Structures are given as C-alpha cells and as structure tokens.
Amino acid sequence: MIDVNKFDSMQIGLASSDKIRSWSYGEVKKPETINYRTLKPEKDGLFDERIFGPTKDWECACGKYKRIRYKGVVCDRCGVEVTRSKVRRERMGHIELAAPVTHIWYFKGIPSRMGLVLDMSPRALEEIIYFASYVVTDAGDTALEKKQLLTEGEYREKREEYGDGFKAAMGAEAIRTLLRDVDLEKECAELKEELREATGQKRTRAVRRLDILEAFLNSGNRPDWMVMDAIPVIPPDLRPMVQLEGGRFATSDLNDLYRRVINRNNRLKRLLDLNAPGIIVQNEKRMLQEAVDALIDNGRRGRPVTGPGNRPLKSLSHMLKGKQGRFRQNLLGKRVDYSGRSVIDVGPKLKLNQMGIPHEMALELFKPFMMRELVKREMASNIKNAKRKIERRDEDIWDVLDDVIKEHPVLLNRAPTLHRLGIQAFEPVLVNGKAMRLHPLACEAYNADFDGDQMAIHVPLSDEAQAEARLLMLAAHHILAPKDGKPIISPSQDMTIGNYYITLEEAGREGEGMVFKDVNEVRTAYQNGYVHLHTRIGLQASSLAKLGTPFTDWQKERILITTAGKAIFNEILPADFPFLNEPTQENLTGMTPDKYFVEPGTDIKEFIKNQPLVGPFKSGFLSDIIAQVYKEYKVTATAELLDRMKDLGYYESTKSGLTVGIADVTVLKEKPEIIEQAHKNVATVAKQFRRGLITDEERYNRVISIWNKAKDDIQAKLVENMDPSNPIQMMSDSGARGNISNFTQLSGMRGLMAAPNGKTMELPVISNFREGLSVLEMFLSSHGARKGMTDTALKTANSGYLTRRLVDVAQDVIIREEDCHTDRGLDVTAITEGNEMIEPLYDRILGRYTMKEVKDPNTGEIIVPANVLVEESEARKIVDAGVQKVTIRSAFTCNTRHGVCERCYGRNLATGDEVEVGEAVGTVAAQSIGEPGTQLTMRNFHQGGVAGGDDITQGLPRVQELFEARNPKGRAVITEVTGVVDTVEENPAERTKEVTVKGETDTRTYSLPFTSVLKVKEGDQVHRGDALTVGSIDPKELIKVRDVLSTENYILREVQKVYRMQGVDISDKHIEIMTRQMLRKVRIMDPGDTDMLPGTLLDISQFKDRNTSAIIEGRIPATARPVLLGITKAALETNSFLSAASFQETTRVLTDAAIRGKNDPLVGLKENVIIGKTIPAGTGMKKYHDIEPEVVNSNVTDGVYSISELEEKINEQQNNVESSN
C-alpha cells in the first residue's frame, strides 16, 4: 500500500487504452458471475479469481494450495495466485471492445469537449456516434469537405460519383480518426491569430476552443484518448454479490451494466467473425456504444436502463455523485469503530469535564484496554481468557474497568454538529442504567435537552489522540463561543433562578441590620432562622480581606452592607476577586463601591432603611462574571466556578420553593376598557373605508396597528402592576425562562395571529390563556402554529445547506504565518442604520491589530500605537476618547496565500488569546455564520404597506443573496460619478423620475421607476457607488464602479445588519474571511505578452506571479479585473479538483480536471480527508511535525504515571520554592 502521508500532490488525467490494459490483471470475457450450485466465481467471468484474486485468504480456487506458506504461488491447476482476499478490492480487469466507443462524459458534458476539439456541434457528433450519419474523414480530391456530414442516401450518391476518392465513416471509429488528425499546435496558433480580430460570439467560441486545445497540449493528454478500445472493470469487492436468506442474490447494479456490455461485445465479435451484413454490425456497434454509455453514466443520454420495478440502475457516475456517492458517503464521512450511541440524561452531580457512561457501554468500548489490563494484572492467563471473562461479566472486572477508563477522555457528539462545540471531550465516570449522563452546562453548546435526545460517543485510541482530546477538546476549554468570544457555558433555567433568588434584597426581612464577624457566622445565623437570604446585614470587611478579597485600606476598616445571600454567593468566586454587591461592570472589573461601607458605630439599621434596594444578579450578569473570571484566571478556575455556580443554583432554586399556580396569573382590571376603545377605533376605520375615504390596504394596515397598540397598552399596564415577588415575574426577570410576551399571553391578550400565507389576520384573539380561548379563537391560533412549524422545518434545511456551502468555500483558509507584512489596512467605523446602532466601534476593534496608531482627536496624543493587539481596556479608551475611525489589520488586506496571517486575524475568539499558526479559521468562520442561521427569519418583510416600497429581503434569504452574489430583490440604483445631484424631475408620460448627477468631468442622468423612493435631493453631494434610491445595492455593480475593498466592506456591513437585527452577534473577522474567498479570482481582460487567455478566471496570486515574471523578462504584463463569485461558484472554482468534485457537479469537475491533467496541491482540509492524509491544520501542520521535544525540568516527571500524580508533584515543587523564598 502507498503511504498517503508521503506525497504532496495528486494528479488526474485521461487514461489511454494502453493504460487501462496496464492496470488490468486479465480480460473479462464472459458475462457470468458465480456458479449457482457451487457459489464459486465462474472462469473468465466478472468475479474470476484468476483475474481478481482469491475469495479466501491464502487459498487458491481449487484448494491445492492453502495457508500463508504458499504466499505468492500461482496454482498450476486453477491459475489463482495465493494471497490475501483483500486484493479483490484493488485488482482491476478489463474488457477488450470489438469496436471503439466514445466516453459519454467528454461527448455529452456542457460544453461538449469533443465538440470543441473538433469544432463540431454536439448534434452532429451524436449523429455520427450513434450511426445516423456518415462523416467525411478524408475528402481526397473531391468537392467534399472534411468533417462534412452525409446521410445514408447522400453517402451512396457520393460513392457512385467519386468512387474511392474519399473516406467517410460513422461511429466512434470515425470520431477517433478525426481526433487523431487534430494538430493541436497548429490549431492553437490559428486560434490565437483569430482572437486578434474576432469579436462577439465568434471570439467567445474561439476562447473556449483555445482553452480546451491548450489544456490537451499542456497536459500531455491526447484527444483520441476520449475514445476507448478497452474499458476497465472495477474490483469485484466494490460491486459485490451477496446471497440473501431464501437463496436469492442481491447484486450491485454495476454487474448488470457490465453484463450488458460483455453480452453485446461478444455478440459483435461473433457477427464480425461471420462477416455479417453491415447494417446488422452497425446496429450492434450502436448498442455496444449505448451499453458503455449506460455503464459510465446511465440516464445521461436517452432513457436510463432500468432494473426490476423500473428503477434506473446506478452507474459509475452515480457511485460518485451526491450525498450517497463515494465522496460524501465513504470518503468524507466514515463510520468509525470504538463508538456507540445512547439516550442522554442529566448528570447534575458531574464536574464540568465529566460525563457518565453506562457500565455495559464502557465495557464494550474499552474491551481491548480491559483485556490487556486483565492479563497485566494476572487476573487472566491470556487474551482469550480475558475476553471470556469479560463476556461472562465476572464480578472482579468492574474494578478493573474503573481504573481503565480513568484519565482516558472520550468524545461526545450530538447531531446536527453545527459548530465545533458539537464535539467535545469528557472524562468518563461509570453510571448505572443505559443512558449516558451529560453535564447540564454542556447542553447549550450541543443545543441538547433531555427529552429523548441521543448522543454518540467515540474513544480516542492512540496516545496522541488522547493528549489532543485532553489538551484541546476537554469541555472546560470550550467556555467561549468561537462566533463572538462570549461565554457559551453559562447557567440557565434552575441554575439562573437559584443564583437570582440568593442575591435578591428585600426591605424589612427578619434580622435586618444585624452585623456579623465573617461569612461562617452569617451562614450559622441563616441556618438557625435568625436571618433570611434576602435580609440586608452588616459584615466586617476585614474578615473578607483576610481571605484575599481586594478592598482599599479605607474599606477594610469599615463594615460592608450586603445581604446574607450575597455573602454566601461571593464564596463561590475566586479568593482575590472583587466582592460583588451590585450587578454592574464597575463592581465586576474594579472594586466594591464605597457607598456600601459604613463606619463601625453607625446605626446600621437606620442606614439600611435609607438605602435603595439593589437588583439581583440576572442571567446576563452571571455570564459577565464568567467572562471576567475566564479573562483573569483562565480555564481551571472558570471550570471550578461554573461547577460551584451550578451546585449553588440547583440547591437554592430547590430551597426557594418556586412554584406557579393559577393565582399567580393576575387579571388586568383595565383590559375591558382598552378592548372596547379598540373596537370603536376599528369601527371608525371601517366607516371611513365604506365611504371611500381610504383604500382597502390602508384600512387593513390601520386595523392591524389598532390591535397591536391595544396589546402594547395591556402589556405596559401589566408591567406597571407587576409584583416583583411573583414567581412568573421572577422567572422572566432573571432570564431563567419566558419573557414579557409570554406573560402578556397568559394574563393580557394573545393579540393578532399570523395566517399561513405570512400575512397577519385582522381578527385578534382577545382572550388570554387565564380566561381561556373561545372555539373561534382557538381555530385562529392554530393557523399561526402551523406556519411556525413549517417555517422551522424549511429554515433548518436551508440553514444547513448554507453552512455546507460556506464550509466548502473556506475550508482551506488556515493561519499560515505570523505576519504577512501588508501595508494596507481596513478603516472601521461603527455600523449604523439611520439612528439605529447595528455594531458599535468597540466590537469592531476588540481583539484586532491596529494598522496605524490611534490618536486622541482632542489632544492628539497616541492612545494605541501601530501594530498592537487591541485589548478590552484599549478598546474602551479609544471609544471613550471619541475616536470615530480606526485603521485595523484585516483579512481583506492580508497578503498570505491560501490563508491569513496571525496579525491580520487577531485574537482567537474561542480562547481569548492571540490566534496560533495552524488554526483552521476558515471552517470556524463558516460554522460561526451558518450555525445561527436557524435563528434568522425566513420572511421577506413588507415595508408596512407603503405604496411603492419594494419588499426588503431580510433574514436567511438576504444572507444567501449576499453570499451567492445574486441580484438583490429591490435593487437600488447607484451613481457612477462623484459630484452633485443637479436635478430631480418627474416624467409622468413615461412614469419615471429622472435624476441627473453632475460630476467634474461627466454628467449622468438616471431614469428611475415612478414608485421608487429617492434617497437624495437636489444639491446633495454624492460619491460614486452611492445609492440614489432606497434598496439593496448589487455588489457586482459596486465592484465595477468602486474598488474591491469597498465592495468587501459593503458585504460585511450588510451581513452584519441581518444578524445583529435578529440579536445574533458574530465577529467581523468571520464574515471577512468568507467575503475574501468570494473575491480571490480575477478575469483576464488583455493577456499582454503572457500565455494567459482572455476571459479566463485566475487566482489573484497566480495572476501576480505570472505578471511579475513577464515584467522581469521585459514583456507586456496582462490586465485583469476582479470578479465577485457566489460561494457555490467560488467553491467549484477552487484549485483542488478533489474538493470541488466532492462538493457539487462531480462529473463536470472531474471531466474538466482530467482533460487539463490537473494537479491537486492538497492544501485544504477536504482533499486531505478524502485521500486519508493528516489534515494540514492544527497539530497536523508540517511546522509542528518537525519538532524535537525539548526536555525541561526532567526530574518532575520521574516515575510518574498519571496526571493527578504529576499535578501533585508540580504543586509540591512550587510550594518548596515559595517556602524557600
């Protein structure tokens, strides 16, 4: 076998008939498969052991030679080589054809490759190949022309007229003759001449022909290889035949297709031997051609060959195509050993990086490790006995199992894996039952719940795999989400409500104003009922300072006013973390505010009475605490805090006794008045409509707004009258579950419902759930529910497909180097829409490198120098100083090939540190954009029925429109000149508006539809590329009028708009990477003195290289213009044919790659996965493979076997060092 890790690239080409014969181990002559009695393969048949190898390991067909000692012997009786049966998966045979046939891919593809080489139409080719017309292959001295088509009648006439003065033929033989006659070099030279003058259609055709001919010329492929004399027979184990119970056979469709070819081929041979009449032979040749076509690509031409039940047979092409094809089913996604799946259940007592594994599962998954350990401990004499012991479930194996799984991480995965947090590593802990246990905080990343979800478990086997699982994939490392760098693990539901409840404050609770020495005393008082969790008390600050809490000297001498609950809550935080007394950023990042401290001797009860109540810690603030702890203390401390927060939350939410009863749903007294008023207003509107004062559309819009206002009024009243101790209010306020709109539906009114067509129905549901709905109202509600369900189902599929396309276009973007030394940057400002802030400047500069120094606009002093990573503190300074625009390093302007450099990328959001070389940022970017896709809406919004306002596409369709570079719906007209809007005139006759823009050198007039809404008025200054009307700019127009960078910037801003409007935060850098991939190609306009062809697409880097060498040699360089490709097109235009073929349009990609003799440099991830090579990202990068480990402080690890022992030793050493200091 070849070692895939040894080679650097892979080439594809056309196979000549000689090549096919050289692959073959013998000719298949008979259509037989296996003997129905002996079930042994037939001689010379499709499963022949002489050709393909033995069916049993180390055994010939007749049984004369058995066992490995005869390895390599060829049996003299049956002619079978003694070897492994595995060779039946790799040895090929061939069929010698009695007449040549054309390969359907090259004849039928669009454009027809044969047609381009021969300069003939596909229709003409079809007539020749399928024996409908003759073609002149050699005109001799006659008046005929080469390649002229003749019908049967015309052919006879010409034969009579000219005799043997010309040659004409039909079928693939004629095509092969013509292809052999093509002089590639001469044709290329002629076409290049023609290109100098040609225009229009003629030029396009010439460019396409030249492209194909040069491809043949440069690749060393010969055009006549598109016609075959022999066809390969793929190994039998890849087209198996298996016996079903009941004695019938199931076989791969390929065997049927091969049998048809062999039958027809053998019949043709016999007919030729018999010298049968030409018409019969011709018919048989045509049938052979059709049989080979069906084998290669069934259904491409004519009706597909069908099997039983009229099912089209799967040909070789279908084996590669689609989700079930070879690429996506077997090469990119394999089933793996050492894996299992089970239902998940909650494991509230687990630590963050643990999972519970059922005994039975662990025993099966860790069986080899168990057997080794049993033999090692001499509990079993050999592996066989150990296996028996495990199968018997002996009592003494369970302790061994406990030790085997200790410190051996396993991977858990939940489908659908939308982002990289869908697979994480945990340390297994044995549990009873058959369900796996998952830590409740890991649910959010997996989007898992415990209503019957299943998860898959995988065991990393090698030491390297285990080390990577532990150091890179352990759940504790996945605290921040890669899409925005905010914590993805944060307490939810019960945990939130528990922590909310413990930090609540109430006035006048029992024991208010008591002063305590330390937290232990507070806890004792609480447990004995002297104080309540919500009681405001005094606590000696010095006792907390002794434990490490940072207080100023002034604060240390005073008494801290807090509540009993907050004192207990603060115990879970790291020792030297500020004491949290209020949910504010100042308290979190600075110190506890001075206002909570009083002098000893003050009347504390009186002081407390005059103090306002401080709000409890809600879900958002808990998340902020986690982010801050992670930033300061990194992984271990954060994981510990999370577990403590979880335990405290569950404990306190249980103790709080939070319940919901019908009495908790309050009824609003003012509701009948509001409803009555709304009814009156609706009646007024109806009257106006009847009198013809308003149109039906206006009436509809007004009715909708009346009912929406009524609902809003009821909601506002509810909020006013809300009791803060109401359990439903507590749930929604803390962020544990539910929001104000749920509350309105329970005790206010349900309001308007959506109809299945997406419009809102005029009839509102006036009741709420507390009162109960009437039958009609229930019926109205059900419409909206169905719409919601269908929308969700469609959205999931659309979003998944978007993710797949995004991953495909960006999978080869990896951090390749530390600095690309670019001299360009990106100017960023806050993204706004009207008065609404979409993305503030702070978010855009955080975690990025500055390109130029940032100066204070007032004083001129430098806030942040150039080439520095902007941390939180610097970003805050920049924003506070009032800076509006910052120039940063960006993926848009990075010079690195096939990727990005560390400086242009900035911070790795998932770790909070600078990104490292090898990080697969392209895949992460694609997942970050695709994963929230399901949260986006599917709708196009109407502009509130404003006449003439086109629908604005939003949500998922808008994201697809931008990334696919489609013409946007509701397109805006842009100006092509910079200048002043001179006139805006209406032209009622033409039903248009005319806007004239006067530039310095040029004046343009734009004729706009009458209904379009203008963005400009007379006298406005406009810059080229600015929109004149309301709507979406077409980026393809923008790139023509402006430059690449402003187009990239426009796409970035537009994508951000969609996501941020829906409340989804995504970092700019992900969108930058995707947009850059859409703009990495240029189209050659004028080739100059280079060998590039006009109109071809080239990578920017290749284009620059070729131009550089042309300039060095003193030739005229080529000119090109940048091209914006949609992500699907960009993914297919990649340099890797393996990656493109496994994405879409498999046959087209492979046909093209073969003709060009393409070389796949194996730069991306996908192509390496396909050939089974280590991916060139992360620890698989070359850079990391050539490292010699350096021994540091070797005495630490002497005689240490487990990680826990190692940690103890290291701690011991540190303690010794500290004590000696």
Curated annotation (Swiss-Prot):
It comes from the Bacteria. Its cofactor is Mg(2+); Zn(2+). It holds the Pfam family RNA_pol_Rpb1_3. The keyword Transmembrane does not apply. InterPro entries: DNA-dir_RpoC_beta_prime, DNA-dir_RpoC_beta_prime_bact, RNA_pol_asu, RNA_pol_N, RNA_pol_Rpb1_1, RNA_pol_Rpb1_3, RNA_pol_Rpb1_3_sf, RNA_pol_Rpb1_4. Its EC number is 2.7.7.6. Keywords: DNA-directed RNA polymerase, Magnesium, Metal-binding, Nucleotidyltransferase, Transcription, Transferase, Zinc. Binds 1 Mg(2+) ion per subunit. Binds 2 Zn(2+) ions per subunit. One of its GO terms (molecular function) is DNA-directed RNA polymerase activity. Zn(2+) 1 binds at residues 60, 62, 75, 78. One of its GO terms (biological process) is DNA-templated transcription. Zn(2+) 2 binds at residues 820, 894, 901, 904. CDD domains: RNAP_beta'_C, RNAP_beta'_N. Transmembrane segments: none annotated. It catalyses: RNA(n) + a ribonucleoside 5'-triphosphate = RNA(n+1) + diphosphate. The RNAP catalytic core consists of 2 alpha, 1 beta, 1 beta' and 1 omega subunit. When a sigma factor is associated with the core the holoenzyme is formed, which can initiate transcription. PANTHER family: DNA-DIRECTED RNA POLYMERASE, DNA-DIRECTED RNA POLYMERASE SUBUNIT BETA. HAMAP family: RNApol_bact_RpoC (MF_01322). Belongs to the RNA polymerase beta' chain family. This is DNA-directed RNA polymerase subunit beta'. The lineage of its organism: Bacteria, Bacillati, Bacillota, Bacilli, Lactobacillales.
